[in-house]
Each structure stands twice: as structure tokens, then as C-alpha cells.
Curated annotation (Swiss-Prot):
Subcellular location: Cytoplasm
UniProt-recorded name of the protein: Peptide chain release factor 2
Modification comment: Methylated by PrmC. Methylation increases the termination efficiency of RF2.
Organism: Campylobacter jejuni subsp. jejuni serotype O:6 (strain 81116 / NCTC 11828)
Main location: cytoplasm
Length: 365
């Protein structure tokens, strides 16, 4: 990097921060935080626990947004002032240090962009994730289990907690179906970008001839709904089946039919839960999963309508990403257009940067 490239980078980043400031209006956030502080000091505030909880979540969200904005604004100002000073004094050592820190400065601005993009109504919610293998038997089942591990590692990296709701092992390898709840700040905001079809190209470990195989798995992500959001489900529209649970490695195998499957006829959505030994609890969780899926489906319909009939880029039926392990190694996202060569790292859960690229690309459209 040289002086010209760094000065152009500063201009680009200043424009970004300026645009973000005009959207989030930091002064309005500060005013709102003062209002919340006054509310919290009122003796009657804590008498309504539910409302206090809602305002508490709002406070956390806008405090983080303001903090990210101030960090980005200050880092950019400091870099700009230091750059001007180093240039005037022909201080090559300081200039070199600024050039080396340029990626870190870009990451700070990206962090601000992402916190702004994750300010939607549902982004802060927990996420319910389901992975279903496509046609192809063992190949697809194995691919689904690789994706499952990738998301578990991602959650581990981000400090998200994971609760398995349903797990069905494949007959020879991998899994037939898995659903899990991801708990943590902005879990849905990040993972909603994973909605869609994931394609794998590799030399099959199950093919003695070592031929190249293509496998598909679908990932479905929906927000865990608060109890106060009402989704009407009519009894005539569903079928409830009960069966014996059979978890991974024989875990929680029950002699009673505690596992629950609900089929929703109008949409074709099927949800299953065998997380608990109690049929009653599994049924309640399965209904919660169904409501979340129906809610997500409605969000997609609204998005399609808002786009005047254009296809939504976050949808259960769209191929969103290709993972090629042979004849070369590359992961390419169809929405951001970005390609990554660190395939092993990605399959080990290092997907945050890739997801952020998708969120930024979709916002720019």
C-alpha cells in the first residue's frame, strides 16, 4: 500500500461512516438512552416486568450500535490525523504502521456496518435451524452432517449456545435430519443468511472408484418467536404423529413414544422434536418450531411482495453457496459473489466473514 491508496481508503471509509451516521442518527440514540435511564429510575418501571424486559433489550441493542459507531468514528479520525501528520513530517515509519493497520481499520468499519444491518425486528432473536439432506442417500446424509458440524463450530466460536431439538442418524453415515436451537445475541440475524440450498462437489469417500460427486442439503432458519406473537394454526390443517425417539449414538432412546412430528398440510412444512423424555414438552417445542417456520415463510412472502415480484435471495429453495473440494478447493457464495480458498477453515466454522459479506451485499441491492 502507498500514500495514494491509503488516502483513497480513508475517503471510502469516511463516506461509509457518514452514510451510516445519517441512517442511525447517533444523537437520536443518545436522546433515547437518556429517556430509558429516566424510565428505569421511575419506581413504577419495574412493576411491569414484561415491558421492562422489552426496553432492556432495546437499550442493549442501541448501546452496542452507538458504541460501534463511536469506535469506528474515533478510529477513522485518529488514522486520518496521524496520516496527515506523518505526511507533513515525512515520517515513513508511522506511515508504514498505518498501512499495516489498514485491514484492522476496515474491520472496525465493517463491524459498524454489520451492527447496523442487524438492527431488524427479529435479528436479535434466537434461531431455529434445520438441515435436510437432498436426494443422494449416503452422500447427501454425510454432507448434511458436515454442515451441522460447521454450524456447531461457528456457534462455539461466537459464544452461542446450541440445544438439539431433533436428530436422525443416516443409515450408513451422516444424518437424515437435524433441528437445533441457537441461543445468543443476533443469532437469527447472522444465521438467516444460511437459508437455502448448499452444494458440495468432491471425490466421494463412499465410492470405491473415487468418482466426483455433487451433493445438496437445504438449511432452513427461522427466528424463535416470543410467546406474545400469535400464529393461528387450525386443528384441521395439521397431523400429529408420535414415535419412539432415537437420538445420535442411541442417546435418549425411549421405550415410550415421546418424539413428536407435526405435518402442516397447507404449506407442507414438517417439524419434529425428540429433545425431551416428555411427550408433552416435545409437542410444545414442535408447535413452537412450526410457528417459527410459518412466521419465516410469511416474512419471505412479504419480502417478495416488497421486491415487486423479484425472487428473494434469502429463501429455502434457492441455491446460495457452492463448496468445491475437487478438482480445486473453493467456497463461493452466489449472493455476495465472494470466493474463499480456505475451505478447511470454513468447514470448521470460520464463516462469520462470509456471512457478513452476504448481509452487506444484500443490503446494497
Amino acid at each position: 500500500m502507498d500514500n495514494y491508496e491509503f488516502s483513497e481508503l480513508l475517503k471510502t471509509l469516511k463516506n461509509k461512516v457518514g452514510n451510516i451516521a445519517s441512517i442511525i442518527k447517533p444523537e437520536n440514540i443518545q436522546t433515547r438512552l437518556k429517556e430509558i435511564e429516566e424510565l428505569e429510575n421511575s419506581p413504577s418501571f419495574w412493576s411491569d416486568v414484561k415491558q421492562a424486559g422489552i426496553i432492556g433489550k432495546e437499550k442493549t441493542k442501541i448501546t452496542n450500535l452507538l458504541k460501534n459507531y463511536e469506535n469506528a468514528f474515533n478510529a477513522l479520525n485518529d488514522a486520518s490525523e496521524l496520516f496527515d501528520l506523518a505526511n507533513s513530517e515525512n515520517d515513513t515509519e508511522t506511515l508504514e504502521a498505518l498501512f499495516n493497520d489498514a485491514p484492522k481499520l476496515e474491520d472496525t468499519i465493517t463491524s459498524l456496518e454489520i451492527s447496523m444491518l442487524l438492527s431488524g425486528e427479529n435479528d436479535g432473536k434466537n434461531a431455529i435451524v434445520s438441515i435436510h439432506p437432498g436426494a443422494g442417500g449416503t452422500e447427501s446424509n454425510d454432507w448434511a452432517s458436515i454442515l451441522y458440524r460447521m454450524y456447531l463450530r461457528f456457534c462455539e466460536r461466537e459464544g452461542f449456545k446450541v440445544e438439539t431439538l431433533d436428530f436422525q442418524e443416516g443409515e450408513e453415515a451422516g444424518l437424515k435430519d437435524v433441528s437445533f436451537l441457537v441461543k445468543g445475541e443476533n443469532a437469527y440475524g447472522y444465521l438467516k443468511a444460511e437459508n437455502g440450498i448448499h452444494r458440495l462437489v468432491r471425490t466421494s469417500p463412499f465410492d470405491s472408484a473415487g468418482r466426483r460427486h455433487t451433493s445438496f442439503s437445504s438449511v432452513m432458519v427461522s427466528p424463535e418467536l416470543d410467546d406474545d406473537i400469535e400464529i393461528e394454526i387450525e386443528e384441521k390443517d395439521i397431523r400429529i404423529d408420535y414415535y419412539r425417539a432415537s437420538g445420535a449414538g442411541g442417546q435418549h432412546v425411549n421405550k415410550t413414544e415421546s418424539a413428536v412430528r407435526i405435518t402442516h398440510f397447507p404449506t407442507g412444512i414438517v417439524v419434529q422434536c425428540q429433545n425431551d423424555r416428555s411427550q408433552h414438552k416435545n409437542k410444545a417445542t414442535a408447535f413452537k418450531m412450526l410457528k417459527s417456520r410459518l412466521y419465516e415463510l410469511e416474512l419471505m412472502k412479504q419480502q417478495d411482495s416488497a421486491n415487486a415480484g423479484e425472487k428473494s435471495e434469502i429463501g429455502w429453495g434457492h441455491q446460495i453457496r457452492s463448496y468445491v473440494l475437487f478438482p480445486y478447493q473453493q467456497v463461493k457464495d452466489n449472493r455476495s459473489g465472494e470466493a474463499f480458498s480456505q475451505v478447511d477453515n470454513i468447514l470448521d466454522g470460520d464463516i462469520k466473514k462470509m456471512i457478513e459479506g452476504v448481509l452487506i451485499a444484500l443490503k446494497a441491492e
